[in-house]
Amino acid sequence: MSTENNSELLYNNSIKILTDLIGFKTISGEDNTALIDYCDDILKKLGATSFRTYDVEKKRVNLFATLKARNSNNKKPIILSGHTDVVPVSKGWSSDPFTATIREDKLYGLSLIHI
């Protein structure tokens, strides 16, 4: 497969994942289990190992995952950290904030730049 095809595939997969992520209504304080399940599934397909921690009510979940470097045991690890809750929807949206919308080569949706 050519580099151009690989780049296009990576771009399309990234847009698909971002589009899916925007669709999860994980407003602060609400259940985020479905989103964590989705992220865990993607990471496991990439070879990650993971574990979860829960709040007292078992509706807010933290996901910790480890993905080892490919082709080398000498590569240094990196840590990515983020959060899954979003702010409540405010006024002023011209489209559904939980539906990814592309306008003029820009992707819009609640939480896209929130991490």
Residue ranges and their predicted role:
Residues 113-115:
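Conserved small/polar residues in nucleotide/adenosyl-binding loops
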Residues 2-111:
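Acidic/His- and Gly-rich active-site-bordering loop/insert found
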